Curated annotation (Swiss-Prot):
InterPro entries: SBP-like (IPR044817), SBP_dom (IPR004333), SBP_sf (IPR036893). It comes from Zea mays (Maize). Residues 18-55, 68-102, 408-431 are annotated as: Disordered. GO terms for cellular component: nucleus. Residues 408-419 have a biased composition (Gly residues). SBP transcriptional regulator probably involved in the domestication of maize. Acts as a transcriptional repressor binding to a 5'-GTAC-3' motif. May repress the growth of lateral branches in length and numbers. Zn(2+) 1 binds at residues 104, 109, 126, 129. GO terms for molecular function: DNA binding; zinc ion binding. PANTHER family: SQUAMOSA PROMOTER-BINDING-LIKE PROTEIN 16, SQUAMOSA PROMOTER-BINDING-LIKE PROTEIN 4. This is Teosinte glume architecture 1.
């Protein structure tokens, strides 16, 4: 398709001529109106068809803003008039206008703070003197603190932190504030005396007590001696003899603990062992014998090695679960003579048994004995095969032993207690 450039140019020229012709009468009409206003007459606008051409035929883009442009001279005059209308600043005390930019507070400093940052202008210090170690302000040597933005004396200043000490103390106090929970726990732990905590509360020591009455780590009571079950009888005999030789003097004399009431258990002499011999599988572990040379109390109960060897070497489990269903409690209290206190060995005969004070069973003062039912293998079922172990009265028991305790109110004999009286057995697990 070919374009006719001449025809397009002719159309543009014709359109421009029409616009120019329409603008000429309009400007003439405005001039006539102005003249009429000066003379007091009113003029009317010309008719639309007076020019002979349509007035609305022009096509233009009304972008706006072009008519608001004014010459530079007029704009300058308007800005000058607005500046004159502003109120002037009040004069200072001396009648002169106040200085716009403050000077540095350091003596002899004439630095222009107008070129510095607003921080330095507000605090009246130049950038150089804000970091100087020593400056003279009002005749005194001071230093500018960058933390509180003030001048301080050298005595109040910390050179390492580049800050005043007063502000540093408050800052450290706020950051290192001690916690109340931590202080309470620390004071509680510090108040506890001793090397370790014990699950049982011990009584306080009294001045009237004999020395060594409390168990300590150096005491032979504190040492745990373990005897292997597979060891021979001779090695076990030597082991128990060594324990008897290590018995302290206050235990050999049969002294009681002062904090125990009358009628309670007291410690007795050391262990006296005898060589093993042929005996039933459930021979008693306690017997009544003559006191040894190292013993201080006569007629005390001693442990025998005969029944111990058979029990340790036995294949039967030392548990109540292996006991036969038809076995009953055995009363063995009639052949032991009555004593006020039932002495007891210092170390457990069978490993794992505890004769400690935490496991003792207290009894009233009227009770002087008890009945004890040891566990026997399944081959022994009768009551007649077990001799006496403890006191003649079977009312209560006051000794802790791994096995079974017999508590009843019978007449005191073995047959009488099983036939006439009502008895009950309390099982205790081996410890």
């Amino acid at each position: 398709m070919d374009w006719d450039l001449n025809a397009a140019g002719a159309w543009d020229l014709a359109e421009l001529e029409q616009d120019h012709a329409a603008a000429a009468p309009s400007s003439g009409g405005h001039a006539a109106n102005a003249a009429a206003a000066g003379t007091g007459t009113e003029s009317r606008p010309p008719a639309p068809g007076a020019a002979g051409a349509p007035a609305e035929c022009s096509v233009d883009l009304k972008l706006g803003g072009m008519g608001e442009c004014e010459p530079g001279a007029a704009r300058r005059e308007r800005e000058a008039a607005a500046g004159a209308a502003k109120r002037p600043r009040p004069a200072g005390p001396g009648g002169q206008q106040q200085q716009q930019c403050p000077s540095c507070a350091v003596d002899g400093c004439r630095a222009d703070l107008g070129k510095c940052r607003d921080y330095h202008r507000r605090h009246k210090v130049c950038e150089a003197h804000s970091k100087t170690p020593v400056v003279v302000v009002a005749g005194r040597e001071m230093r500018f603190c960058q933390q509180c933005s003030r001048f301080h004396l050298l005595a109040e200043f910390d050179a390492d932190k580049r800050s005043c000490r007063k502000r540093l103390d408050g800052h450290n106090r706020r950051r290192r504030k001690p916690q109340p929970d931590t202080m309470a726990s620390a004071s509680f732990i510090a108040s506890q005396q001793g090397t370790r905590f014990s699950p049982f509360a011990h009584p306080r020591l009294e001045a009237s007590w004999p020395p060594g009455v409390m168990k300590t780590e150096e005491s032979p009571y504190h040492i745990t001696h373990q005897i292997p079950l597979g060891s021979s009888s001779s090695s076990r005999q030597q082991h128990f003899v060594a324990l008897g030789a290590a018995t302290p003097a206050y235990a050999k004399e049969g002294r009681r603990f002062p904090f125990l009431q009358e009628g309670e258990i007291s410690f007795a002499t050391g262990v006296v062992l005898e060589p093993p011999a042929a005996a039933p599988a459930c021979q008693p572990l306690l017997r009544t014998g003559a006191p040894s040379e190292s013993s201080g109390a006569g007629g005390s109960k001693m442990f025998s090695d005969q029944g111990l060897a058979r029990v340790l070497d036995s294949d039967c489990a030392l548990s109540l679960l292996s006991a036969p269903a038809n076995s009953s409690g055995i009363d063995v209290s009639r052949m032991v003579r009555p004593t006020e206190h039932v002495p007891m060995a210092q170390q457990p005969v069978v490993p794992g048994l505890q004769f400690g004070s935490a496991s003792w069973f207290p009894r009233p003062q009227a009770s002087t004995g008890g009945s004890f039912v040891p566990f026997c293998p399944a081959a022994v079922e009768g009551e007649q095969q077990l001799n006496a172990v403890l006191g003649p009265n079977d009312s209560e028991v006051s000794m802790n032993y791994g096995g079974m305790f017999h508590v009843g109110g019978g007449s005191g004999g073995g047959e009488g207690s099983s036939d006439g009286g009502t008895s009950s057995s309390m099982p205790f697990s081996w410890q």
